[in-house]
């Protein structure tokens, strides 16, 4: 992972609680391709068996893996689709960009998470900013797809996914976005430091 040298690195304890706490897990158009290929299923079959289109509290429509009893791909506490897991899972918990001390307050609902055992720190976790940029591109395209389509349909999904893959191949765009995320992370850290100085 790329990040600042002094940034603490998260070490997952593989407790699996983060995979069992939400009723659904958002997935991108590319996630649908990767997971369905990993499972040996046609995308439409994967989608109809495991997914639904959900509307977020902000009013955005996304595809999501339904998880009323936890992610259906967790096996014995571990991810059964690790090598093709959703982009949102790849970037958790680094995607928060919060300083470790603040992040610990947000994950206290996951009492076995490795973050809670980390020393307080005013730095964000070491993060791969290019991967975070790719995540943003994937979900922007996914959001746009569901603004234009009422449901999942393999032909239009394939066309949209091909455009998404082309966009992800734009190294200059990913680099620009990664720098913007890095700047946002620095601003969050500075804001946190200023708050702690006032106390």
Segments (PLM) and residue ranges:
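Short loop/turn segments that flank or connect secondary-structure elements
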Residues: 1-199
């Amino acid at each position: 992972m790329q990040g600042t040298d002094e940034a603490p690195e998260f070490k997952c304890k593989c407790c699996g609680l983060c995979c069992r706490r939400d009723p659904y897990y958002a997935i991108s158009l590319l996630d649908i391709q990767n997971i369905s290929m990993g499972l040996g299923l046609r995308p439409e079959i994967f989608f109809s068996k495991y997914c639904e289109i959900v509307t977020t509290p902000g009013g955005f429509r996304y595809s999501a893996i339904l998880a009323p009893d936890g992610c259906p791909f967790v096996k014995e506490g571990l991810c059964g689709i690790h090598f093709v897991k959703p982009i949102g899972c790849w970037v958790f918990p680094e995607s928060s960009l919060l300083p470790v001390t603040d992040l610990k307050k947000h994950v206290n609902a996951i009492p076995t998470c490795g973050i809670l055992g980390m020393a307080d720190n005013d730095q964000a976790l070491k993060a791969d900013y290019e991967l975070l940029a790719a995540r943003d591109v994937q979900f922007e395209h996914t959001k746009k797809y569901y603004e234009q389509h009422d449901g999942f349909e393999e032909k239009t999904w394939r066309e949209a996914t091909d455009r998404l893959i082309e966009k992800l191949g734009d190294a200059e765009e990913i680099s620009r976005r990664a720098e913007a995320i890095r700047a946002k992370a620095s601003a969050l850290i500075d804001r946190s430091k200023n708050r702690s100085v006032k106390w």
